[in-house]
């Protein structure tokens, strides 16, 4: 059942065209305009006069939502591509796609089209961020804080580099020196 729904989803996202740079610029501006208006309400605590939109503002919000949805659906292939790379690390593919889509949504809301970057380049970081956060918070029985998980990742990378360079498993002292952190911190992580 899950395989067929995943296949249907993958088939559906494959039908959406990628956006041209001009479309990204136009839609990015619409989303920025929407975010500027809705942020005003958010900063006011979600209620009150700041949340009473004029008809023109309501139109800007509607156009922004449509542009946001189109940017998301046009870039879901990027999410799936990245999610597949993270398979087998503790979460199902569907969960990874969901978390990657949350990262993509954040990227759409934060994207500044005037900076000259393609949206997919910008979104790549946000999607990876969403996937890495999900893996660090959801893939273990005992949740390890994100900052500790990031240090563990750096420790593993340092260990691999030192093993490759020296041909031996590095000591705690060597790891601490290489990472420029106290030996006690390395021992806590190990």
Language-model features, listed with the residues they occupy:
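Alpha-helical residues within the helix-turn-helix
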Residues: 177
């Amino acid at each position: 059942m899950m395989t067929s729904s995943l296949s249907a989803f993958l088939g559906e996202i494959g039908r959406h065209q990628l956006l041209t740079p001009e479309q990204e610029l136009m839609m990015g501006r619409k989303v920025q305009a929407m975010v500027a208006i809705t942020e005003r309400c958010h900063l006011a605590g979600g209620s009150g006069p700041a949340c009473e939109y004029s008809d023109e503002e309501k139109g800007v919000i509607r156009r922004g939502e449509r542009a946001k949805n189109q940017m998301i659906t046009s870039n879901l292939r990027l999410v799936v591509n990245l999610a597949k790379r993270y398979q087998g690390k503790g979460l199902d593919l569907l969960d990874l796609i969901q978390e990657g889509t949350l990262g993509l949504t954040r990227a759409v809301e934060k994207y500044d089209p005037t900076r000259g970057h393609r949206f997919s380049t910008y979104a790549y970081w946000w999607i990876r961020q969403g996937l890495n956060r999900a893996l660090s918070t959801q893939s273990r029985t005992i949740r390890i804080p994100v900052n500790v998980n990031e240090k563990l990742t750096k420790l593993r990378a340092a260990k691999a580099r030192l093993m490759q360079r020296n041909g031996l498993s590095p000591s705690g002292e060597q790891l601490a020196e290489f990472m420029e952190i106290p030996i006690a911190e390395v021992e806590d992580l190990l």
